């Protein structure tokens, strides 16, 4: 049974929501930085949002991950756990700053 087919544990759901709240905050900061023409800061926060989004998906599936900022590694893990997300995860590999 693949991770998405398993029941989602309530603790995993709560932790994934916590990660997603941080994703939203990073995207808000990226938008504000873009409006101020601070494109480096914007790119950094978009990368952070992509990283945390992938970690939220792994947490939701109950999949452990090591403390890393490696989007390529996280995308590979997402592709294994959620094969249907593979094209989207692959696109996030290129967001590294």
Report each predicted region and the residues it spans:
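Terminal alpha-helical segments
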Residues: 1-97
């Amino acid at each position: 049974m693949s991770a998405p087919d398993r029941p989602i544990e309530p603790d995993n759901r709560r932790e994934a929501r916590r990660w997603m709240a941080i994703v939203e905050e990073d995207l808000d900061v990226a938008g504000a930085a873009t409006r101020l023409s601070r494109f480096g800061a914007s790119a950094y926060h978009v990368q952070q949002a992509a990283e945390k989004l992938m970690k939220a998906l792994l947490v939701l599936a109950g999949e452990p991950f090591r403390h890393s900022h490696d989007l390529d590694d996280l995308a590979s893990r997402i592709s294994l756990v959620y094969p249907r997300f593979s094209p989207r995860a692959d696109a996030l590999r290129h967001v590294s700053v």
